[in-house]
Amino acid sequence: MKTKAIVTLAIGAAFKKRWERLCADNWREYAQKHGCDLVILDQPIDYSERAARRSPAWQKCLILGDPIVKKYDQVAWFDGDIFFNPLEAPNIFDEVPIEKVGAVNSFEDPSSVENKVALERLWKWLRPSPDVPVAGEYKTPQDVYLKYGPPVTPLPAMLNAGVLVASARHHAEIWREVYDNYDDRGNPSYYENVPLSYELVRRDLVHWLDAKFNHLWAWSKFLHYPFLGGPGSRSLRDKILRRLTKYAGNHYEQRIAVACATAALLNCYCLHFGGYAAEMEWVDLKSAATGRVGNLGVR
């Protein structure tokens, strides 16, 4: 038996089908390359009424107590909407001391300066009008912790719980405490993310990973590909022209989207589609495996 494993939850037929269709081969290649097992949990760990009332995302806090998972010395949790760079993604276990939890700082993805710009553009795009803020809008990790409220207090850093490296022996009890003692409080609590981050950061248990291990596709979009923002940002003239070219058989818009998403994967180790899972279809993993974006054929 191997001593390390990649773990995720794939609960629900639609979610599991999407993971198997889009991610399975990519994940198996990464696990095989780095000598890890791959553990896919497709049933809830907790069947209680409380568990049924909240997102399955909370159940990642229970994986370290799972009979299969806890046999490993160290495991890496990945949300099921992530692709590995097939050429350059290194062994994530080499980065993290076993007594620490490996994670990416949410506000340093891809860097602190670029993250600030990406957030500003995101809020601007989401606001119904320039002077009306979005519910849950924030600028700093302190803002997010404050919005969650007591017993959480502001801290200078926040992790993204989409990618976590941990050890059952060292961390199962703390993760279980988060599951038992916290609950959803709406945006921007992001389910388990804020309380789990709070408890791990305040105890100085986090080993900060290179942001490339958990790069949000949303940030690539808002930093580099704003033209992929969506139909709401287009003029009527633009919408008509796009429709006409599509009917003419020139699917240039789709080809450009594929090129952008594939390039984003090549620029990081793990590309995370949190909130944009439908756009996982844009990634061309065959091209990514060559290190080049395929021919667009744009006319």
Residue ranges and their predicted role:
Residues 8-10, 42, 78-80, 86, ...:
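Short His-Asn-centered micro-motif
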Residues 55-58, 116-122, 223-229:
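Short, surface-exposed amphipathic charged segments that create phosphate/polyanion-binding patches used
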Residues 1-72, 168-169, 277, 283, ...:
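N-terminal anchoring/stem segment of glycosyltransferases
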Residues 49-78, 84-95, 99-105, 159, ...:
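A conserved donor-nucleotide-binding helix/loop in the catalytic core
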Residues 15-16, 47-50, 84-87, 92-94, ...:
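Short catalytic/ligand-binding loop motif for oxyanion handling, primarily in non-cytosolic enzymes
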Residues 84-133:
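Conserved donor-nucleotide/metal-binding helix-loop-beta segment in metal-dependent transferases, i.e.
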Residues 76, 96, 100, 150, ...:
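A glycosyltransferase accessory/donor-loop signature
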Residues 128-155:
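Short, flexible, basic/aromatic active-site loop/helix in glycosyltransferases
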